[in-house]
Amino acid sequence: MKALVAATALGPALLLLLPAASRADERKKGPKVTAKVFFDLRVGEEDAGRVVIGLFGKTVPKTVENFVALATGEKGFGFKGSKFHRVIKDFMIQGGDFTRGDGTGGKSIYGDRFPDENFKLKHYGPGWVSMANAGKDTNGSQFFITTVKTAWLDGKHVVFGKVLEGMDVVRKVENTKTDSRDKPLKDVTIADCGTIEVEKPFAIAKE
């Protein structure tokens, strides 16, 4: 009888713990990946490998639509053949300037620039993909991939994706030699790019 009472007493306690644990899991659970884009990178004349990026179309639909269209080239312009023009170790790698190639160009599918969609997501750690800009509401086509947590960029740059595969390729680019302006000495080129089907949206952790 005593054992039964003890088990009964434990029951409510366990039940009370479950909602709290669920809330903790919800907080840890990040945005849902609704689309994927791949970049096949080349450093100099050597193939460096493939980077697969998950995109959060429910959180930042307009930003994701722009990125996907630039990856497929469906509007007649986009990322294919463009370069990562700025690389800073222990910070990020930046690309997407397919008009000038030096960080001063690029354009969106909506026109030259488009507004910041929202800042719901943060730069939680390595591998998060965010829009480069020249200040408020100046998004075009340039983006960067973090190689460390960059909390100081939160609320200033729109995060819209995360590297799902090929972070080793990102690291390879991060460690390439650069000049005094952070430009790689060997061209880091997006040799090919496009989309990968996502059958069902899935959430990833904020890490």
Curated annotation (Swiss-Prot):
Q: How would you classify this enzyme at the top EC level?
A: isomerase
Q: Which organism is it from?
A: Gallus gallus (Chicken)
Identification of the protein by name: Peptidyl-prolyl cis-trans isomerase B
Q: Which InterPro entries match?
A: Cyclophilin-like_dom_sf, Cyclophilin-type_PPIase, Cyclophilin-type_PPIase_CS, Cyclophilin-type_PPIase_dom
Q: What are the alphabetically sorted keywords of the record?
A: Endoplasmic reticulum, Isomerase, Rotamase, Signal
Functionally, this protein is described as follows: PPIase that catalyzes the cis-trans isomerization of proline imidic peptide bonds in oligopeptides and may therefore assist protein folding.
Q: Where does the protein end up?
A: Endoplasmic reticulum lumen; Melanosome
PPIase cyclophilin-type domain span: 38-195
State the encoding gene: PPIB
Pinpoint motif Prevents secretion from ER by residue range.
Answer: 198-207
What EC number(s) does the entry state? 5.2.1.8
Major location, coarse class? endoplasmic reticulum
List, alphabetically, the GO terms of the cellular component aspect.
cytoplasm; endoplasmic reticulum lumen; intracellular membrane-bounded organelle; melanosome; protein-containing complex
